[in-house]
Amino acid sequence: MATGGQQKENTLLHLFAGGCGGTVGAIFTCPLEVIKTRLQSSRLALRTVYYPQVHLGTISGAGMVRPTSVTPGLFQVLKSILEKEGPKSLFRGLGPNLVGVAPSRAVYFACYSKAKEQFNGIFVPNSNIVHIFSAGSAAFITNSLMNPIWMVKTRMQLEQKVRGSKQMNTLQCARYVYQTEGIRGFYRGLTASYAGISETIICFAIYESLKKYLKEAPLASSANGTEKNSTSFFGLMAAAALSKGCASCIAYPHEVIRTRLREEGTKYKSFVQTARLVFREEGYLAFYRGLFAQLIRQIPNTAIVLSTYELIVYLLEDRTQ
């Protein structure tokens, strides 16, 4: 049985490992997050494309011109940002992201580890129900604490300025939100974040199941030394990527709703009202705008975060024992 000192040491270890993993992942995948947020926004510029309608019965063969709006894809948005705003705009929101991601991941993993200890004493140890309740509890606490920082980050990512013009920094953006919307403005999109807990639960339930399978796999048990560590590390990366990919596809619509709720001067007021309005005005496909960018960002990001976390825990636990 762990003593009070050992439990405190374990909590600090999970805080540190989670913070390091989150920071590394945020830096590497920031440009993709900016593109994803732009794609999710209702302010995404639509290109009007004109398709000629051909009438065979006319002498000229040409008829009316029919305008059709086309939503730009990932590469069009990337090209637009580079041409109009410059490469620095691909790192918009990195400041609040770095300020928030380390404590966010640290709080999440510490809460997750602590909750798992508690739920293991109530349910069958390390069962799926333990992972589900632990992930849900950790996500709820983390979302409640960190929403103001993510709100500022989203606003900064949505700000579009031409190349060379001055953009708001993190403190200026936070001050502007407070002056125009008050304290409540920092909690816009929180209901959508709570809905997104389902994604976290799905992700960790799949991840823990895959991790358990990898530990019991014949290849893992037959390997030894460096080979075993290498196999485990890359296995965890693959498990993290797969679990996040599945979870993102299932629960993605809440991300679009959250971005809409965080837009400045928005017509979107609540989670349900936003969902109805987006569906009525843009159709169900609008709920999946930016999914491709999300997948190619989140899958490597989650793999980096979880594998860095597991690696640091493994290395430091060995040294403290």
From Swiss-Prot:
Keywords: Membrane, Mitochondrion, Mitochondrion inner membrane, Repeat, Transmembrane, Transmembrane helix, Transport. It is found in: Mitochondrion inner membrane. One of its GO terms (molecular function) is pyrimidine nucleotide transmembrane transporter activity. GO terms for biological process: cellular response to insulin stimulus; cellular response to insulin-like growth factor stimulus; mitochondria-nucleus signaling pathway; mitochondrial genome maintenance; mitochondrial respiratory chain complex III assembly; mitochondrial transcription; mitochondrion organization; positive regulation of cell growth. The chain crosses the membrane at residues 12-32, 49-65, 121-141, 190-210, 233-253, 298-318. It catalyses: UTP(in) + UDP(out) = UTP(out) + UDP(in); dUTP(out) + UTP(in) = dUTP(in) + UTP(out); 5-methyl-UTP(out) + UTP(in) = 5-methyl-UTP(in) + UTP(out); 5-methyl-UDP(out) + UTP(in) = 5-methyl-UDP(in) + UTP(out). GO terms for cellular component: mitochondrial inner membrane; mitochondrial membrane; mitochondrion. The keyword ATP-binding does not apply. Belongs to the mitochondrial carrier (TC 2.A.29) family. This is Solute carrier family 25 member 33. It comes from Homo sapiens.
